[in-house]
Regions:
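Membrane-embedded translocation segments of transport machinery
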Residues: 16-19, 25, 96-97, 101, ...
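Short, small-residue-biased leader/transition segments that mark boundaries at the very start
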Residues: 2-7
Length: 184
């Protein structure tokens, strides 16, 4: 029934964001509240990205030391990944998005005139807060259902460059980090 479908979708969303597969069976701007987007989905996006980074740090340390006795503290790696890498980068990318016109507010829908001259109601919300961690953590669950192809989520060429950079920077940094740990 319809009620059980809602619970199934909620369970699926929760589990998929917890394990970083970010399967999204809803359109973010209309399927979730601002609170849920900011304090549940975004939290999972930070935690799942930091979990992958922390696990990789442990693997790199074990390769470098050639022993499993000194791989470090997973929880320390997790907190450092969130507070020293993901959060600062998210703030910088979010600031760029705001400067370029990505919505950041709680105003609801706005009326716009399309290229064809028709008026249409378009959702907006805390998009500039959610997009950076979605991109940095290579998460699939975006604020808008069509993700970065939505004109409000990615309004200019500069936002497109910032979002593409955000997807690539952490995986590329992991390659350099492996070289640092192995001294090569």
């Amino acid at each position: 029934s319809a009620a059980s479908d809602v619970y199934k979708r909620q369970f699926n969303t929760c589990i998929s964001f917890m394990v970083n597969c970010n399967l999204q069976h809803y359109s973010g701007e209309s399927g979730l509240t601002y609170f849920t987007q900011l304090f549940v989905i975004m939290l999972f996006q930070f935690i799942t990205a930091a979990t992958g980074m922390a696990a990789m740090a442990g693997i790199m340390k074990s390769i470098a030391a050639k022993t499993t006795k000194t791989i470090g503290n997973f929880w320390q790696f997790l907190v450092v990944s969130c507070t020293r890498i993901l959060l600062p980068l998210s703030l910088v990318v979010g600031f760029i998005l705001i400067l370029q016109g990505t919505p950041m507010g709680f105003d609801g829908k706005m009326k716009v005139t399309t290229l064809e001259g028709q008026e249409q109601m378009v959702s907006q919300g805390p998009t500039a807060a959610i997009v950076p961690i979605k991109q940095l953590g290579t998460n699939g669950g975006g604020y808008f259902g069509v993700n970065s192809s939505h004109p409000l989520e990615n309004p200019t060429y500069l936002t497109n460059m910032a979002e593409c950079w955000s997807i690539l920077i952490i995986p590329m940094a992991m390659v350099f980090a492996l070289g640092f740990y192995t001294r090569r």
